């Protein structure tokens, strides 16, 4: 299943390894796609080189939205482009 693709900064993780969804590129993608974040929502998170599926959660500690990801499931974007061509 394809999930909405939202920019995320893979260097902007909290202490639990969740990606913070508060960068300008993230906010722009959410706005452009009219997405309102909700607990349990599934997203495809990407940057210039990487992509991974994640589950949205609200961080009470930081008062912002985060995405729980499996760091072992991160895919290289280049690999995905090559597979699409083949």
Language-model regions: role of each:
Residues 36-38:
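Short, well-ordered loop/turn sites that connect or cap secondary structure elements
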Residues 50-61:
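Short beta-strand-centered aromatic/proline hotspots
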Residues 2, 64-86:
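Glycine- and charge-enriched low-complexity intrinsically disordered segments
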Residues 5-8, 30, 61:
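Cystatin/cathelin-like cysteine-protease inhibitor module
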Residues 6-25:
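Short, basic/aromatic beta-hairpin or loop at an interaction surface
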Residues 42, 46-52:
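Short, charged beta-turn/beta-strand-edge "cap" motif at the junction between a beta-strand
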Residues 23-33:
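Short alpha-helix capping/helix-loop boundary micro-motifs
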């Amino acid at each position: 299943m394809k999930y909405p693709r939202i920019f995320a900064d893979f260097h902007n993780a909290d202490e639990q390894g969740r990606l913070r969804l508060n960068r300008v590129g993230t906010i722009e993608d959410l706005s452009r796609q009219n997405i309102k974040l909700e607990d349990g929502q599934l997203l495809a998170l990407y940057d210039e080189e990487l992509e991974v599926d994640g589950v949205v959660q609200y961080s009470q500690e930081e008062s912002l939205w985060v995405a729980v990801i499996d760091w072992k499931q991160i895919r290289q974007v280049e690999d995905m482009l090559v597979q699409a061509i083949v």
